[in-house]
């Protein structure tokens, strides 16, 4: 043919010059797709094909050959699928990122909404084009190509006509949306390869990445539909949690109510000042909301910057008995404090108590009643007077932790002077009138306790005590049922002043059986 690779015959029946060097030295197996020699010998095939077979062949574009893509299956242009809602096609490709699929209706209009095609690796230099069909009917399945070393526009590669006998269920099916820089940033899908249908509202997305320039990923969940904003309906909740894995990252998702959700995942970069980059996205159909309490802890940027690690829990907390605890691993001597809220109301600071041992700080929490609460955790570096916000969790309590919930209030001097609680790590609920409290302390510290009524009026004088082996046990007789306060005072003999210093207090509830 004299015009081979030089141009094409247009609709105006005129020859249009358009040189294409890829048409020269082409493998006859691919040349036969678009040109049928009248003489079989010029097919240069081991097994020549008939005119009828030629007319069934799909016609790859010149760009397909230029970028080195080859058909390994489905070499005809029309396929009928009776018993399935999907189709898989195999191709040879030197790179995964140079291919993209697309699904159109019979008129050639690209389908909107969910992504119905996916290109996935399937062995060395082999890829699979997978397509799902939203409904029975006729569709055009397309494969697009581009250069490997640039992000130029996608160009037509191949087009198939598919007669689908089945379609996926409503609000089902489809594949993840892949960002423009997905492969350039070194990401690969691990699982799932399709959009998610969740029976319990939970989803787990795993993606591979070994790029040292990526510092992490984050997920953002949105409920599909107008005027449906999770931030408004679930203020204070975080519905995505990311964990580092050996291969990359796992994003855990909680859907709070049944419905259709859109999950978008973004990459964080080590390069300072660079904004987060879109990685991929999924549709999640939740058939139920996560119960009894959805969501995950919210961590501030400072939490990571200080080198802290949230050990447990890594989900919001459900506590049938009203008692919760949070463990944080810290490389430094950070002083943690917890503050409980219900709605917009700040609750008594005495409902939280913090202990530290072997580099792990534990924040204990008492719910004062049934309901949902928000725990805000703050941290203060040694030598600093300012506490900084670090984290928040939601706690759902089925009951109050106690009839007298909360913990003793301890001033900084209590710990700085070396005092420790031996018993009664919580506020005291006593069914008897006699109460004892034991404190350990250095030999240069002496302690005394005083009893006050619910109106903060002192009852009597200092309470009797016994000291042995650097421990002091104080005895107290409660005069009647009701609420009281035990105030702790101490004297530090190593200081010039020997005056008593207020160190802390217990709330006491005397309730006879």
Predicted features by range, described:
Residues 81-86, 124, 198-202, 246, ...:
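Solvent-exposed, conformationally flexible loop/turn segments
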